[in-house]
Amino acid sequence: MAIVKCKPTSAGRRHVVKIVNPELHKGKPYAPLLGTKSKTGGRNNLGRITTRHIGGGHKQHYRVIDFKRNKLDIPAVVERLEYDPNRSANIALVLYKDGERRYILAPKGLSAGDQIQSGINAPIKIGNSLPMRNIPVGSTVHNVELKPGKGGQIARSAGAYVQIIAREGNYVTLRLRSGEMRKVLSECVATIGEVGNSEHMLRVLGKAGANRWRGVRPTVRGTAMNPVDHPHGGGEGRNFGKHPVTPWGVQTKGKKTRHNKRTDKYIVRRRGK
């Protein structure tokens, strides 16, 4: 994988930094695993904006990813690595011995031709998926389930991983990249290794249009608006003279956003501490 800085042949190319991976498949994706993906423009069924800064962008197909890894004890071979426009990570097309193909998240170090497997008998090897009670303490994993059988929910983006730091009773303790430590049932399944394409964070789009291709619309500062549009709006100059808030008046600096009290007992240490 190479990090390429473009030559300044135009203003839009001057600052572009691209991530080039020659291992990625250059043809079309595997059609039976594609789904439709409709544009919402950030609107709900009433036509009202519920999420700002969404609209336009290139048409995309959804790739159906196997987050559950529930095809047990059947070996599979990696056919190819592919780009996925719906996520920061790359994906791998795997062919199982019984002839079925599935997409999985491509871990770091996985290449075409490698063999992977799921189940309690799977060896501790990059790309293999098994319950965390069978994974040694200290291992790095990704695509971690929060509930047995629900499919991976933690550590799915490019370069993400979780470390198993303890096992006690029916639970394992995980250390997340954010610094949070939380308990998860040891029956939950995780995949060995970290998610690939960790250089994703180093890319530079270089121009506003590149964000528009991705369906991201401009973000206007509150201080640049009128008082009717934002609590920061109006006044002379750029000072708005109050604590910063969202367009709906909710504090933005340090306000707690977590409301799921039911699972607080599983968090051993909060993030950022």
UniProtKB/Swiss-Prot annotation:
<keyword id="KW-0694">RNA-binding</keyword>
<keyword id="KW-0699">rRNA-binding</keyword>
<dbReference type="GO" id="GO:0016740">
    <property type="term" value="F:transferase activity"/>
</dbReference>
<feature type="compositionally biased region" description="Basic residues">
    <location>
        <begin position="253"/>
        <end position="263"/>
    </location>
</feature>
<dbReference type="InterPro" id="IPR005880">
    <property type="entry name" value="Ribosomal_uL2_bac/org-type"/>
</dbReference>
<dbReference type="InterPro" id="IPR014726">
    <property type="entry name" value="Ribosomal_uL2_dom3"/>
</dbReference>
<comment type="function">
    <text>One of the primary rRNA binding proteins. Required for association of the 30S and 50S subunits to form the 70S ribosome, for tRNA binding and peptide bond formation. It has been suggested to have peptidyltransferase activity; this is somewhat controversial. Makes several contacts with the 16S rRNA in the 70S ribosome.</text>
</comment>
<keyword id="KW-0687">Ribonucleoprotein</keyword>
<dbReference type="GO" id="GO:0003735">
    <property type="term" value="F:structural constituent of ribosome"/>
</dbReference>
<dbReference type="InterPro" id="IPR022669">
    <property type="entry name" value="Ribosomal_uL2_C"/>
</dbReference>
<dbReference type="InterPro" id="IPR012340">
    <property type="entry name" value="NA-bd_OB-fold"/>
</dbReference>
<dbReference type="InterPro" id="IPR022671">
    <property type="entry name" value="Ribosomal_uL2_CS"/>
</dbReference>
<dbReference type="GO" id="GO:0019843">
    <property type="term" value="F:rRNA binding"/>
</dbReference>
<protein>
    <recommendedName>
        <fullName>Large ribosomal subunit protein uL2</fullName>
    </recommendedName>
</protein>
<dbReference type="InterPro" id="IPR014722">
    <property type="entry name" value="Rib_uL2_dom2"/>
</dbReference>
<dbReference type="GO" id="GO:0015934">
    <property type="term" value="C:large ribosomal subunit"/>
</dbReference>
<comment type="similarity">
    <text>Belongs to the universal ribosomal protein uL2 family.</text>
</comment>
<dbReference type="Pfam" id="PF03947">
    <property type="entry name" value="Ribosomal_L2_C"/>
</dbReference>
<comment type="subunit">
    <text>Part of the 50S ribosomal subunit. Forms a bridge to the 30S subunit in the 70S ribosome.</text>
</comment>
<dbReference type="InterPro" id="IPR008991">
    <property type="entry name" value="Translation_prot_SH3-like_sf"/>
</dbReference>
<keyword id="KW-0689">Ribosomal protein</keyword>
<feature type="region of interest" description="Disordered">
    <location>
        <begin position="221"/>
        <end position="263"/>
    </location>
</feature>
<dbReference type="Pfam" id="PF00181">
    <property type="entry name" value="Ribosomal_L2"/>
</dbReference>
<dbReference type="InterPro" id="IPR022666">
    <property type="entry name" value="Ribosomal_uL2_RNA-bd_dom"/>
</dbReference>
<dbReference type="GO" id="GO:0002181">
    <property type="term" value="P:cytoplasmic translation"/>
</dbReference>
<dbReference type="InterPro" id="IPR002171">
    <property type="entry name" value="Ribosomal_uL2"/>
</dbReference>
